[in-house]
Amino acid sequence: MNDKQTILTLLLPKAVLKAMTPEAERAVPDGMIESGLISIRQFPFRVGRESRGAIVDGEFQRTERPRFGNRKPDNDLYLIDAGPLLHISREHFQIESTAEGYLLVDRGSACGTTVCGIRVGGSDTGGSAPLRDGDTIGIGTESTPYRFTFISGLISDSR
């Protein structure tokens, strides 16, 4: 592989998540989203919650997830769940690349995940479902505002 190909392989996304709601777009930290798109450059790609929320003196306040030393992050993407009722678990789901295609794995989240409206996991049980180009991912309950579309096949991911 030449240097240019190596650079492109490292920098270009293998897939993306497209934010489908304003709430989903606002949940993504600055620097992780561009034009409503989140780049996925490696698999598994792990997603979870960045912060907790609480009502203090009648106002919603967010407390950040503590970081301990040089510990490796639990997620590749930390979403900010701004609602008073949390939809997103700290370690919610991951996207895997397999020989057969892509797989969404719920990592034992409390509220579960949906793939095109089909419930995966929830009640801390975990679960998995095939994930195809164009599928919609809902993070949390049926009424979650955190919805994304999975777009695959951008470059080869050495499956």
Residue ranges and their predicted role:
Residues 1-86, 135-136, 145-159:
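Intrinsically disordered, low-complexity acidic Ser/Thr-rich regulatory segments
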Residues 30-31, 86-88, 122, 130:
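Short solvent-exposed loop/turn micro-motifs enriched in small/polar/acidic residues
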Residues 33, 74, 91, 101-102:
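Hydrophobic alpha-helical segments, principally membrane-spanning helices and signal/leader peptides
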Residues 47, 94-103, 108-110, 114-159:
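C-terminal boundary/linker segments immediately following FHA domains
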Residues 82-83, 90, 125-126:
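A structural connector/turn signal
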